[in-house]
């Protein structure tokens, strides 16, 4: 167990400021008290007035509109914001949408009806230059509302993209945020105030797409949206997950317990299930048939209630599929000794559905502590073309995996975020990529797993008040503002005081030191036996997170153990 203390280890006077400064936040006070003054006016986005005027003109002319829904949570929320907004300002608008079959992104010309006058592409489409030109030639206009990096501005589409807007300083805002800005621009032109009611969707989309929660504008939208959950589907999702979230609508709880349900439907749901979810996002008031298990008769329930039930089932289905595929992929990794490479490159043809590639790649990156590339055949792109997903390992040496791959010059494309992207490559070039990366990083320990800890505290000096204080800051945590880790040293515990708990299977290790409980999940029988093999007193070091276990109104301070090492064992001291 290795760790590195970052910051000044101030756990007495202002621990929150210590944590925030460790995350690169220069003004903790401003961060904690973020307000509307951090919002950047939409007019700083290039082409936004042009896009707003274009949509208004098409609505006035009663033209046919087509929205392509992108295949992730940010895509569904950004499309929902735009479609719901259009229905608000123009209830009779002739608007249609299309959901992707799988995890595709952007538009496909043959799926857009010939009589469409305006195509709107939220959360995608900036770099689809050929498609823009083809649609233009048949007389169709295109509005792109996007946030992804792109090399240039399209000549044949109206592109509103914060990455392509030099005067718009917030590059972290995602598709849902950009959709909201678009609606704001239309509001001002029409003297309306409809965009504000969709802030809950703005928040969900930004959190799901791992927007940098250090950015003040982005954080403001996240916070405001979670304070104002009005959307019926979102309200029921938070209600369903109340046990896990303890009723706390925080950024971290949303990322862990709400967005994975929506994502599961996008990844493993049938076309009918995805369509029902989209109708729920679009505020449908319909009733749908539902038959309870063990009953012969069906009843009609609200679409939002039924959709939440379906999402729960799909999340469980996704877990079963991912677990089974994960075993097969890990077997391949071991059989072919792939961990010897600097980057984990795995050919997964026939093992895993395309829609789950990114999810599994992310899990493998966390487990193997190195960047991961999962590849499969892609006959649609060419006979000898492989495509798939990459995921970086944020805590490792390589901070921008996408750039490293692009710099090899061997890929057809690598598109997406620095540590989460899709790619295409010629089969023979993938072998060369592996050689290039192995050579480039031959003297670097890519898997170096040194945990950055915010505080290092001897066990004898750790106070329950400090643990409860840190737990009270949980609403601040999010992407790039990670929950703090604490290194607790020289903790002495009698072996017989260590418990192994669980209802069906014992998987939790627990012990108490002073007023503080220590708990480690996913601890099987083998782990417990190894930990308790010695007699006497264990002297251990622990890396963990501060938690508070609340029961019947009483809060018990806990350390959720991330890593544990036994430093030494000593004999029991005589008590007389």
From Swiss-Prot:
Coiled coil: none annotated. Keywords: Exonuclease, Hydrolase, Nuclease, Phosphoprotein. GO terms for biological process: DNA recombination; DNA repair. The keyword Phosphoprotein applies. The keyword Hydrolase applies. Its EC number is 3.1.-.-. The modification Phosphotyrosine is found at residue 473. One of its GO terms (molecular function) is single-stranded DNA 5'-3' DNA exonuclease activity. It holds the Pfam family DHH. It comes from the Bacteria. Putative single-stranded-DNA-specific exonuclease. PANTHER family: SINGLE-STRANDED-DNA-SPECIFIC EXONUCLEASE RECJ. Belongs to the RecJ family. This is Putative SPbeta prophage-derived single-strand DNA-specific exonuclease YorK. It comes from Bacillus subtilis (strain 168).
């Amino acid at each position: 167990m290795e760790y590195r203390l970052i910051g000044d280890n101030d756990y007495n006077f202002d621990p929150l400021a210590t944590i925030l400064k460790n995350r690169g936040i220069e003004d903790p006070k401003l961060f904690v008290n973020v307000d509307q003054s951090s919002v950047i006016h939409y007019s700083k986005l290039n082409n936004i007035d042009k896009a707003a005027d274009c949509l208004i003109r098409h609505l006035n002319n009663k033209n046919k509109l087509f929205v392509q829904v992108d295949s992730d949570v940010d895509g569904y929320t950004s499309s929902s914001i735009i479609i719901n907004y259009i229905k608000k300002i123009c209830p009779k608008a002739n608007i249609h949408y299309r959901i992707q079959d799988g995890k595709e992104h952007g538009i496909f010309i043959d799926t857009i009806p010939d009589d469409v006058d305006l195509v709107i592409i939220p959360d995608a489409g900036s770099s689809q230059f050929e498609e823009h030109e083809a649609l233009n030639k048949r007389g169709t206009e295109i509005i792109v509302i996007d946030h992804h990096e792109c090399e240039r501005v399209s000549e044949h589409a109206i592109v509103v993209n914060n990455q392509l807007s030099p005067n718009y300083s917030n590059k972290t805002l995602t598709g849902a945020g950009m959709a909201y800005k678009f609606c704001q621009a239309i509001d001002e032109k029409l003297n309306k105030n409809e965009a504000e009611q969709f802030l809950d969707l703005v928040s969900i989309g930004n959190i799901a797409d791992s927007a940098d929660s250090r950015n003040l504008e982005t954080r403001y939208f996240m916070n405001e949206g979670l304070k104002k959950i009005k959307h019926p589907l979102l309200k029921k999702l938070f209600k369903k997950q109340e046990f896990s979230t303890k009723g706390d609508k925080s950024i971290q709880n949303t990322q862990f317990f709400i967005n994975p349900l929506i994502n599961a439907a996008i990844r493993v749901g049938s076309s009918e299930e995805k369509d029902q979810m989209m109708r729920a996002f679009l505020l449908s008031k319909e009733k749908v048939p539902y038959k309870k298990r063990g009953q012969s008769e069906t009843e009609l329930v609200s679409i939002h209630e039924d959709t939440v039930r379906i999402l729960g089932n799909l999340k469980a289905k996704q877990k079963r599929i991912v677990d089974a595929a994960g075993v097969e992929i890990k077997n391949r990794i071991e059989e072919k000794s792939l961990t010897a490479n600097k980057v984990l490159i795995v050919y997964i043809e026939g093992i895993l559905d395309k829609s789950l590639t990114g999810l599994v790649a992310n899990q493998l990156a966390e487990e193997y502590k190195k960047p991961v590339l999962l590849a499969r055949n892609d006959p649609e792109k060419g006979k000898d073309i492989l495509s798939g997903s990459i995921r970086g390992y944020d805590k490792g040496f390589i901070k921008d995996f996408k750039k490293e791959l692009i710099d090899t010059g061997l890929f057809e494309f690598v598109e997406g975020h620095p540590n989460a992207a899709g790619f295409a490559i010629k089969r023979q070039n993938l072998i060369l990529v592996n050689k290039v990366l192995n050579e480039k990083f031959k003297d670097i320990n890519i898997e170096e797993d040194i945990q950055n800890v915010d505080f290092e505290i001897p066990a004898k000096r750790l106070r329950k008040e400090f643990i409860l204080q840190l737990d009270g800051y949980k609403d601040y945590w999010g992407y790039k503002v990670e929950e703090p880790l604490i290194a607790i040293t020289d903790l002495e515990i009698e072996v017989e005081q260590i418990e192994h708990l669980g209802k069906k299977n014992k998987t939790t290790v627990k012990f108490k030191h002073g007023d503080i409980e220590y708990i480690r999940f996913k601890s099987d029988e083998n782990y417990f036996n190894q930990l308790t093999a010695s007699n006497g007193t264990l002297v251990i070091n622990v890396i963990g997170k501060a938690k508070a276990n609340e029961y019947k109104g009483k809060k018990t301070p806990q350390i959720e153990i991330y890593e544990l090492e036994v430093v030494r064992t000593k004999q029991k001291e005589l008590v007389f």
